[in-house]
């Protein structure tokens, strides 16, 4: 009990420090006090990647390496990982140890799990997977399913991928009073902290509740935000360049019975060219871009933030929802954006507790 209280106190302390840091960073832009969303202190990561270390004839271990010193660390448990990842880890190695086909040249194992209790395990090899691998992997999957329920296995090697049944999991997220189902595809980006993702989607839905017109989202992934926000807009136009993510987004639109979201497989630069009538694209046949009244834009850039051209482009919109995984590059972008827009609301999402990482959201409205 004492440890639990101590751990909670430490968690609240680090969360408060992040809140102070974000408040200081946003102060030059006259931002309101950030709304703060806490994470579960442990078992919050729904995905993990481990290198596999071979010792002797039969021994296998999960390891991680220090990125600077290259020192090797054995991983016997993973407290930040989901409960399901931690339950799967020892049993999976136990089953692989006794099978030469599965064990030989195995160098990495990736886990993808869901709040809904599903798991996808990717086995990565420094060898070509021969005809013996698939039956061995099928037997492995059957053993795991007997103990853990909905588990799928994928094998990958150089220019080779073997999918036994599914290369995805189906997640169910609670957003307000709605349950949304999301296909999450192996080796594609998904939000790692599912509990925090639910809170992010809830906040984004709340800040856009009174919006008029249509929404544009750049690089929508599997439709994570677009689907949750669709109810607040007449229509949603979303761009994405990765084929697996586009496929997942189309599935998610259909399974959630959402009829006002259009996914375009194109880059932000291509979309801007199409919207300005500078270039025609065959993939846009039958889609009248000029009929959209996109007053609101959603951007969720990588750590590098938005490039100057994209910053200039999004300034044309009445409202901007900016989800950031790096407050420094967010602030760099805000130096330009706040020339034309005010920060109406902002939030801190503690995506990765006990790290320096800060996820944040900023809702900008034209002056």
Curated annotation (Swiss-Prot):
GO terms for molecular function: rRNA binding; tRNA (uracil(54)-C5)-methyltransferase activity, S-adenosyl methionine-dependent; tRNA binding. GO terms for cellular component: cytosol. The active site is at residues 325, 359. It is an enzyme of class 2 (transferase). Its EC number is 2.1.1.-, 2.1.1.35. GO terms for biological process: tRNA methylation. S-adenosyl-L-methionine binds at residues 191, 219, 224, 240, 300. Keywords: Methyltransferase, S-adenosyl-L-methionine, Transferase, tRNA processing. SUPFAM superfamilies: S-adenosyl-L-methionine-dependent methyltransferases (SSF53335). It catalyses: uridine(54) in tRNA + S-adenosyl-L-methionine = 5-methyluridine(54) in tRNA + S-adenosyl-L-homocysteine + H(+); uridine(341) in tmRNA + S-adenosyl-L-methionine = 5-methyluridine(341) in tmRNA + S-adenosyl-L-homocysteine + H(+). Dual-specificity methyltransferase that catalyzes the formation of 5-methyluridine at position 54 (m5U54) in all tRNAs, and that of position 341 (m5U341) in tmRNA (transfer-mRNA). Belongs to the class I-like SAM-binding methyltransferase superfamily. RNA M5U methyltransferase family. TrmA subfamily. This is tRNA/tmRNA (uracil-C(5))-methyltransferase. The lineage of its organism: Bacteria, Pseudomonadati, Pseudomonadota, Gammaproteobacteria, Aeromonadales. The gene is trmA.
